[in-house]
Amino acid sequence: MSSVHAINQSYWFSPRLPHVESRSTRNSSHAYKTHSHAQFSIGAIEHGETLCHYRNETYHLQVGDLIFIDPQQPHSCNPLPGKTRSYHMLYLDTEWCLDQIAAHCGYQAETLRCSRIVLRDPALFIRYQHVVTLLYRGEITSADHHLKAMLEPIWRQYCLPAPSCLPALPHHASQNTTRHVRERLLNNLQESPSLETLAEELNLRRETIVRQFRHDTGITPMAFLNNARIEYAKSLLKQGTPLVDVSYQSGFCDQSHFHKTFVQYTAATPGQYARSIFDNK
């Protein structure tokens, strides 16, 4: 596995356009743990090939492909063995996306779920690349305009939700377990309950909790907690919080554990991420 210090990658974020974050990675063979993002994610493959595991399927992405990943959905996109790939990611604030969708469909959407996962549309791909270029140039107003124009056909064709007045699907007992575990883990990232404590609260075996949680989310409770901690750490780094404080506030026992986990989920060190973000402020 290649060192993260050798990966040619960059992040873009600016408080002048807070609903957008971009990541660009070039000629990388680095693999990722299964993870999720709070944002709606759109990826674009510029070079090489990628295998993306998402919603219990594996998608073979090639140059020119776009992939849509819904908020909070576990996934992993990794290169073919011994190969490299180059790609861009756009991470779009979910509430902002829902407002944009509502403007097109005429009613407020409550959840964001695209009916299409992989799309090959050469014209849309070029528009995507143009948005990324504008972001890194710092042309904020133009980037925002072109981003909204690029997204409009995506919203209309693939992401229009059903009206919220439709009856909700029934919940199973395992989903109640999963909901309880998620809420307890997210309630206090610094002092999250142990699996033993959760087992006592739910009157279930630890193995049962892990199995039900994995069935409903695609990942284990510990993987979910680590992912949540890293996402929170990224938000603190965007605000300029010192690394030592980010580690503690995100719930990591020490800097070493924080550093290792951050690399596993982002293929960047916390310092690399922070420096790349602040280059655009």
Protein language model annotation of sequence segments:
Residues 162-169, 212-217:
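Short, Lys/Arg-enriched N-terminal segment that forms or immediately precedes the first helix
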Residues 183-187, 192-197, 204, 214-259, ...:
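Terminal helix-turn-helix DNA-binding modules in bacterial transcription factors
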Residues 3-109:
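N-terminal regulatory/effector-sensing and dimerization cores
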